[in-house]
């Protein structure tokens, strides 16, 4: 039976010399759905119109570049002999932690320039980021990557998985854990959790911290099952180290901002422009008069 199993076609569409892969289509779909969610929520929160459409133009390209650089840095041995392959992103190899670094840095710079609340923006974006990740993992599925250790077909059938998933997990003569699916499900559940937390009316920044904590917990354990890990040396899994740092960092920032009285505004509070030094000086001058 196994001899007849063929992997799903990675190509979504062929237009003359141009090939569109499922990997890019699914990542793009995740970005679009995430953008629509965030854009609608930003309007409900009273943020300036077209805030997210403006930000997406900068954040997404930078996030993709950082995602690729992050991956290539930890897998340079694959590209050293043929560096042009660094640009072959349709083959896979975009690291979410790299995308987060690039995206968050870009968002921080833009919010400061436009006098918007960075924490409000990240809170609004948090569920959208997670749903984008959940959908994007199916791009890994189409590429037959992000899989775990070997298992039997009976094990996969016991999970009540559809036939097409079971067959796609048959790689080079062996069945593997569909860790892409575990993470995708974890992320979809996380989206629901974050949407429920919106109603709790956390202080600004704390919904984003909740996202970092939720995603990192799942990623830490699922990463331990994977065989294609990015590594530091021979024994340290990069994603597990970064996940621990994100959890600790999010908890510390959560505590620090509350302890220092920096987290005064809440998620459901109406939008207000971010305070700047210039605004503070003007306020002081008015008081003197």
From Swiss-Prot:
Q: Does the keyword Nucleus apply?
A: no
PROSITE patterns registered for this protein in UniProt: LGT
Question: Mind telling me which InterPro entries this protein's record contains?
Answer: Lgt (IPR001640)
Positions annotated to bind a 1,2-diacyl-sn-glycero-3-phospho-(1'-sn-glycerol)? 137
- Grouped into one coarse class, the protein's main location is membrane
Provide one Gene Ontology biological process annotation.
lipoprotein biosynthetic process
The EC class name is: transferase
The pathway it acts in is:
Protein modification; lipoprotein biosynthesis (diacylglyceryl transfer)
Record GO terms (molecular function): phosphatidylglycerol-prolipoprotein diacylglyceryl transferase activity
* Any Pfam family: LGT
Q: Any keyword Metal-binding? A: no
Cite the entry's keywords alphabetically: Cell membrane, Membrane, Transferase, Transmembrane, Transmembrane helix
Compartment(s): Cell membrane
What GO cellular component entries does it have?
plasma membrane
Q: What is its EC number?
A: 2.5.1.145
Question: What role does it play?
Answer: Catalyzes the transfer of the diacylglyceryl group from phosphatidylglycerol to the sulfhydryl group of the N-terminal cysteine of a prolipoprotein, the first step in the formation of mature lipoproteins.
Q: Which family does it belong to?
A: Belongs to the Lgt family.
Q: What is the recorded name of this protein?
A: Phosphatidylglycerol--prolipoprotein diacylglyceryl transferase
